[in-house]
Amino acid sequence: MIVRNLLGKNRLCCLQPKLLLSTLSQRPQLQLSLQLLCRATRLYATVNDIALPKTRNIGIIAHIDAGKTTTTERMIYYSGKSKRIGNVDEGDTVTDYLQAERERGITIQLAAITIPWNNHKINIIDTPGHADFTFEVIRSLRVLDGAVTILDAVAGVEAQTEKVWKQASALKLPRMIYVNKMDRPGAGFSRTVKEVIQKLETRVVLCNTPFFENQELNPEFRGVIDVIHGKLLKWKEADEFGKEIDVEDIDETKPELYDVYCKAREYMVETLGEYDESIIDAFLENDENYLKISPELLNRAIRKATIDNYLVPVFCGASFRNIGVQPLMDGITNYLPSPLETPVPDIKSKKKQEISAKMANNGLIINNDPKLTVGLVFKVMNHATRGPMAFVRIYSGKLVANSMVVNSRTGAKHSVRKLLIMHGDQPEEVKFIGAGNIGVISGFEDEFHTGDTVISHATSKKAVGTMESTIKLMPIDIPPPLFNSSIEPFTAGDEAHMKKCIDILIREDPSLKVHTEEDMGQTILSGMGELHLEIVRDRLINDMKVKANLRDIAVAYKESYIGKTPTNGLFETESIQVKLSIEHVDDCKSFEDVDGAIIFEDQNNVIIVPESLASETVQSATEGRRWKCPSSYEELHEAVVNGCSMALQTGGPHLGLSLHSTLVKVEFWNAPVEVNEELIPPLMNAAREAVQSVKASENKFGFLEPLMNVRVFVDSADMGEVSHDLSQRCQALIHSVEDESLLNLETANWAKDEAERAYLPPDYTMSKTALADNYKTRKVIHAETPLKEMIGYLSKLRSLTGGKATFDMSFLGMRRVTQSRLNQIF
């Protein structure tokens, strides 16, 4: 904790020789500048020299406006990485560097930065909080070892927090909680922690609790009670940068603080004792006195329980007022895991061979080869001065500059010249990226995509074997786009630049899609939401200077094959033939183990091209060395897949909308491979035309529309009017109405019991506001409704409730559109 850093005698004597040892006994009003800690973090040469056990890869996750970026900026400042504090309102943050981010005051894309703290290296990824940018969070979580969840103390556990928490739980990421904005009227630390226990279904330990001055009259948040060390940390009001802290002992002379400290310590020891027997032993050895158990033992137990996902450490603060951030940073280094303490990632081979992986002292070892380097590309972006960048997490080995890497998706080899680590948008060139670290491969236009696995070897350029070159790390799921907007260049001469810029954005953000409606000649952009496409429009027109018109944003409807039985398609010439069938599919994931199946999860489409279904001519030419075609068998096989995929994207027979929930089975294909001629374009066209031939049966195709799960949070007094509006105007099917009160939530029994058992200190600020009473009468309406009817719903909801209600929604699936509904839509 922060107190150990402030009061550790050896450290202080090392850093500040003139500090007298006698002053350390005068602790009640000891005033120390945290600049000492910043100096301590710079005792080593560079952060790249930090050993793997002292490396932390963490994400900052939360609902929008909870204070993620504000907290991250303070962490950067206190680490000594920046000499100023960046503020969202002033548009000068390190991590929010896009023009659109600074203008809107929100995070749009993930940002990575590396900071030093307490002789540790913390790789931080700051993520967006808005639901439209969920994909940025998804791909961040895949490469992290832990996360800090930031909560607004007034709003509590909000909808997007629950979603992100579930995503992190699925990946078994250890997490910490930081209850922010404790300085605001209506802030409820204990109420928020109780929501954490029940809504997020997790145990907690309170590492610190809030301290208020004038708590009976006009409570003012001034610091925290350190439950581990029994200290009161008060941030000096005169210090606007939050570096000077008064550290005081907590004893019987401060009865109210002492009572909170004792009860919080008792709850901590009892919770840890249920997990770690060493805590029970220490409790018994210390005459059953909760206060006598050493901070070192408690820290070890909390760390072990956090990494094991048994519980979550809780901290509090007010980041905008620069209070409470340093203890949070200590918690990150104390409790979240190093890359050596995380589960082995899911590793597969495209050839379906078994891949061995084990954790060693220097990181993951794959296939018993400590010199084999394997990394995952989780983001691609175009830097203003450095050009294309591929962000990569290295899992094993060491990626070295000027080395050869293999992209297992394409099989291509690339010579990597420069490697970087990022500090917001500022790159720093490095010689290598070691296992467990995050860095950037620079200088490649389209060679790396999100989700690619890169493989290299430390000994030679040829050391990556055939099997190793097919290694694939866990995929990154891409959610389906829900909204469309057409884009048209001003003139034909503007089209090339427009397409180039769209390609750049799609490489950066795979949740953004583009296709062309051939009948209308329109280019259609598809995204996750209205804000997502608005940001795309801003970047194209303002940042990239594209001369084009973007039409109004509309719901992304789809067409789909709805015939009850498969329909056959055929295209043939004298030398090329493709025969296939098309049918409807409900769940594309059920085809994961089918031979030759290619799954397009975002559209729920499947294309199956088994290798055994090539013609005898093709197969015999492969086996008999009579192959004359300049393209390989694998490239021709891929051409068939790509041709089918293009046909699905060009749309259905009615309105040319992209096909969804469609299965294409290729039953036979043939090409003259014994002749030396280019076959990829004609074979791709043949597959495309075979699919197109099925579209002639228009009566076998119908429309699908996005269906959403909706939760509306509303006061009891407004519930009737809101429910009526949902069911009538929004055509919603209301499933249930529940109290938002924690006492009535249907959660696991153990979570209810845990919430009742937990010690939670008084919420002084809530007793001074009507928010507490309002909270007790809130209702939650659960419904499902077509996405089209939810466009602009927030403004309508605010109008109905005087701005007091909120809602969230998540994608449920695609639903077939009935004829009566079709008439309403089109």
Curated annotation (Swiss-Prot):
PANTHER family: RIBOSOME-RELEASING FACTOR 2, MITOCHONDRIAL, TRANSLATION ELONGATION FACTOR G-RELATED. SUPFAM superfamilies: EF-G C-terminal domain-like (SSF54980), P-loop containing nucleoside triphosphate hydrolases (SSF52540), Translation proteins (SSF50447). It is found in: Mitochondrion. The gene is MEF2. Its main location: mitochondrion. Mitochondrial GTPase that mediates the disassembly of ribosomes from messenger RNA at the termination of mitochondrial protein biosynthesis. Not involved in the GTP-dependent ribosomal translocation step during translation elongation. One of its GO terms (molecular function) is GTPase activity. Coiled coil: none annotated. This is Ribosome-releasing factor 2, mitochondrial. It comes from the Eukaryota. GO terms for cellular component: mitochondrion. Residues 53-340 form the tr-type G domain. GO terms for biological process: mitochondrial genome maintenance; mitochondrial translation; regulation of mitochondrial membrane potential; ribosome disassembly. Keywords: GTP-binding, Mitochondrion, Nucleotide-binding, Protein biosynthesis, Transit peptide. It comes from Lodderomyces elongisporus (strain ATCC 11503 / CBS 2605 / JCM 1781 / NBRC 1676 / NRRL YB-4239) (Yeast). Residues 1-44 form a transit peptide. GTP binds at residues 62-69, 126-130, 180-183. Belongs to the TRAFAC class translation factor GTPase superfamily. Classic translation factor GTPase family. EF-G/EF-2 subfamily. InterPro entries: EF-G-like_DII, EFG2, EFG_II, EFG_III, EFG_III/V, EFG_V, EFG_V-like, G_TR_CS. Pfam families: EF-G_D2, EFG_C, EFG_III, GTP_EFTU.
